[in-house]
């Protein structure tokens, strides 16, 4: 009788231990899945933003016409248009947060591309995760002399956390101090 109680207690302990181990492994798997999904969304956003700007730039250059691109960061979409005609709408990943440095905190931005395929003012788009920590930066540079739009992509290094609340000040500081910028970012 005593032997049966020991086996029953041992079985209950084994079941509880198995459940705890399974729960722990599921928790790790869930965290890794979220990290994978975030990385996938960031790569998708970076690719869509870069391709949209290149498309408008090359179309403008080939057709020798002014093209427009609307960046709606609150709706998380890019609208490409030719004069008043809407050509294409690109949806950005919804789980990410976007910030641009073109003007002060406007969520809707309308950019005009010249006949040479350039933008009038250089600026950057920062991509943040759900926790409002910056993960990526896409910078746009227009050069009238060379007649092309240059786009640089930067991945955030893991050394310094930059949040959505301090990105404006951070951007101004690192534009003046490029050495500090390259401590935090890796060009791709």
Kindly give the residue locations of the regions a language model identified.
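Broad hydrophobic/π-residue packing in well-ordered secondary structure
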Residues: 8-12, 33-36, 57, 76-78, ...
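N-terminal single-pass transmembrane signal-anchor helix
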Residues: 1-33
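Membrane-proximal N-terminal amphipathic helix
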Residues: 35-66
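An N-terminal domain-start capping segment
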Residues: 24-29, 33, 37-40, 149, ...
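N-terminal helix-rich module
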Residues: 28, 58, 62, 66, ...
